[in-house]
Amino acid sequence: MTYTSGALTAATQSFNLTHGPAAQLSITTQASGATNGAVFTVQPVVEIQDQDGNRVTTGSQATQNVVVSASSETIAGGTSQAAVGGVATFSGVKLTGTVGTITLTYTITSPTSKTKTQTIALVAGAPTQLIVKTAAATCQSRIACTTQP
């Protein structure tokens, strides 16, 4: 910073600005491509930020775990990731359950609990089995079964 006043010699002062305490999360890469039982095609990346949106890069708050949970379905894989320099990069996360719109919640706990949410569409996976719900019964040659499958 430089200070000036009229005919006086300018004075300068150097200082470093640092981030404040962790106050919010920002999803820099949203999870997408959720097929039932398979890992997301795009894994989420979450940034820990101070109240002004600056990434928290140093101290224990910059390396804390970021946890992802699901609103109603089973979530598995790397659901807890230690941040590195304020960035948590997830891998292997997947959902299993009823297809539909699911809310993912990302959470940190230091200095206080903070969350950020996103929605993701869970779509059906490839068929893996065929189930016969009603078995054919009372079948005779060239005569229709009395109970159809």
Question: Model-found features: residue ranges?
Answer:
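Short, hydrophobic beta-strand segments
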Residues: 86, 90-97
